[in-house]
């Protein structure tokens, strides 16, 4: 099966879940499953890479079991019959805790990373290119399932016509004096694990639809403290998206996500737990504009819990979703979108994942 580019993630899918892997698996393909193990029900969960939705042909069955001290079963099912189990007598997951589970498809095997560390490799028993479906079931809650094919090289259109995606890099923290918004507290420094992935094509079950644009880029899993700063090559343009995931610290007061244009902050998103608000604003020439605070429902972030933020750029505004739910729109105050080319994240969170 020919792979037609990367596909957009499934956001906050209900479990049990089955979804299409567009174009099927290819050598070098990477799938990330982000979520949390439920603390009060069930003793198992499973991630299956299979052909079709019947479950009779599963190329790779990854099955953590919180029994007998905890272990993980790997297996293959062909025509309804299971093969011999491979067991890893170690449990990298904890009940009630978030996880980042990454599957890397290689010519000979699947390599499985849990929270940034290599956990197991599973040698193919059937041709992996037959796989066109991913399923998740059991005692987990999902934040997202994302996809990346680092070998896909779609053509980059002009700004006026391009739908989205952009690679990311890690420049040094910029110098200079910038007026900070009142009472934005610094982050508690903590090492983190991050994966940077491109996901750029529409699929059913997502909030926003997308099509390929710029070649995806993949980075290793460095550990570094907050704040996190990176360039956005090409800047913003209609249909470009940015996705960030992390965990709010238990004692969090505030954190912020900034999209910057030179010394200006085109978009400042500032969840404030001390005010039970999500403040949005723009800073031009070191001067803050009028705040926007309205929300359609309660505060979407919770202390001590994981989150996923999706920022979608459109011609007139930014659309923002939290955990798969649309929460607000922010109309552009700086309209030269391609100059908005830097992302800054800081405050009382642990950042775990960035997709651009």
UniProtKB/Swiss-Prot annotation:
What name goes with this protein?
A: Galectin-9C
Q: Could you confirm whether the keyword Nucleotide-binding appears in this record?
A: no
Against Gene3D superfamilies, the record matches this protein to: 2.60.120.200
Which residues are noted in the entry as a beta-D-galactoside 1-binding? 82-88
Q: Name one GO cellular component term.
A: nucleus
Per the record, the gene is LGALS9C
Alphabetized PROSITE patterns for the sequence: GALECTIN (PS51304)
Record's function text: Binds galactosides.
Source organism (scientific name): Homo sapiens
């Amino acid at each position: 099966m020919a792979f037609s580019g990367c596909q957009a993630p499934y956001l906050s899918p209900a479990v049990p879940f089955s979804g299409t892997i567009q174009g099927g698996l290819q050598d070098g393909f990477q799938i990330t499953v982000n979520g949390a193990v439920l603390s009060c029900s069930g003793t198992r969960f499973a991630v299956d890479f299979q052909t079709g939705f019947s479950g009779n042909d599963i190329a790779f069955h990854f099955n953590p079991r919180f029994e007998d001290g905890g272990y993980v079963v790997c297996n293959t099912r062909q025509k309804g019959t299971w093969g011999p189990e491979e067991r890893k007598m170690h449990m990298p997951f904890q009940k009630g805790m978030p996880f980042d589970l990454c599957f890397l498809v290689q010519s000979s095997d699947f390599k499985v990373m849990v929270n940034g560390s290599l956990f197991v490799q599973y040698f193919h028993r059937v041709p992996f290119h037959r796989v066109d479906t991913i399923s998740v079931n059991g005692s987990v809650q999902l934040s997202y399932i994302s996809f990346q094919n680092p070998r896909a090289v779609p053509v980059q259109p002009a700004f006026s016509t391009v739908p989205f995606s952009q690679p990311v890099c890690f420049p040094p923290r910029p110098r200079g004096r910038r007026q900070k918004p009142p009472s934005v507290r610094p982050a508690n420094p903590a090492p983190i694990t991050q994966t940077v992935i491109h996901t750029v094509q529409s699929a059913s079950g997502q909030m926003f639809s997308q099509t390929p644009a710029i070649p995806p880029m993949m980075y290793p899993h460095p550990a570094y403290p907050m704040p996190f700063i990176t360039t956005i090559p090409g800047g913003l343009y209609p249909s470009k998206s940015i996705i960030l995931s992390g965990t709010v610290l238990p004692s969090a007061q505030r954190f912020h996500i900034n999209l910057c244009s030179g010394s200006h902050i085109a978009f400042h998103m500032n969840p404030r737990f001390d005010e039970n608000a999500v403040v949005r604003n723009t800073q031009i020439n070191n001067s803050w504009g009028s705040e926007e605070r309205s929300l359609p429902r309660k505060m979407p972030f919770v202390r001590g819990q994981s989150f996923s933020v999706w920022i979608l750029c459109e011609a007139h505004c930014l659309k923002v979703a939290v955990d798969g739910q649309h929460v607000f729109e922010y109309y552009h105050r700086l309209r030269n979108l391609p100059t908005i080319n830097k992302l800054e994240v800081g405050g009382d969170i642990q950042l775990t994942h960035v997709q651009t």
